[in-house]
Structures are given as structure tokens and as C-alpha cells.
Amino acid sequence: MSLIVYFSSRSENTHRFVQRLGLPAVRIPLNEREHLQVDEPYILIVPSYGGGGTAGAVPRQAICFLNDVHNRQLIRGVIAAGNRNFGDAWGRAGEVIAQKCAVPYLYRFELMGTPDDIDNVRKGVSEFWQRQPQNV
């Protein structure tokens, strides 16, 4: 049990980060009309958009994915990518999703992440899943 579900825009920054993690992962399609449904608990990784407020911070594709009740019931945590140029709002998508889905905001990283970010997320994800009840 260590699935990562992620969205990456055409910039591919989040995609490259997830690839470097080397964990089982499924990508939310760029096309909002393409439906993805997962059948096991997962941690969501998303980029943050916008320059400050909560409106527009979460990618539309991630919103559509989470609007599926089945998908929303299986989210266990969120990790956000962002840009420090946004100041206090960097990684805001993680805050929004964590609050709306009542899950922990586990980590945030900038753009494609650093080697330290990769190590921190790998370790954190492993520890997170070890703490989860096995019958979930």
C-alpha cells in the first residue's frame, strides 16, 4: 500500500519529481474528460497554481478527480509542488486539498524538487504508510 496519484501540467515538473521517487504512481490525465478512478488508498501530489489566493490554486483536473466520491474516500494525504515566488502562498493547493478532504498536508517542494526533497518524500511516505491501519 503505497500508491501515489499525481497531476502534472504540460511543464512536466511534477511528473519528473514523481518519476524520481520510484514509487508506484498513477497520473491524473491532462484532459478533464478522461476519467481516472483508483481502487486503493493513495497520497495525492499536485502542483499549485495562482499567485496567492485559494481560488485557482488547485488544478481543475485534480478537482475533477476528487469530485468523484470514490476517489475522495481513498485519499490519505497530500503533497504539493509550488514556487517560492508566491511567498506564503507557495504550495497552497496542498493546504486547500488537506482542508477540504480532511487529510494531512505531508510535504511541499519547489518546482521539480531537490535530491533532499526526493529523499524526504520517500522516507516520509514510507513512514506514513507504516502508521496507517492495515484494514483501511
UniProtKB/Swiss-Prot annotation:
InterPro entries: Flavoprotein-like_sf, RNR_Ib_NrdI_bac, RNR_NrdI. One of its GO terms (molecular function) is FMN binding. GO terms for biological process: protein modification process. It comes from the Bacteria. SUPFAM superfamilies: Flavoproteins. Signal peptide: none annotated. NCBIfam families: nrdI (TIGR00333). Belongs to the NrdI family. Probably involved in ribonucleotide reductase function. PANTHER family: PROTEIN NRDI. HAMAP family: NrdI. This is Protein NrdI. The lineage of its organism: Bacteria, Pseudomonadati, Pseudomonadota, Gammaproteobacteria, Enterobacterales.
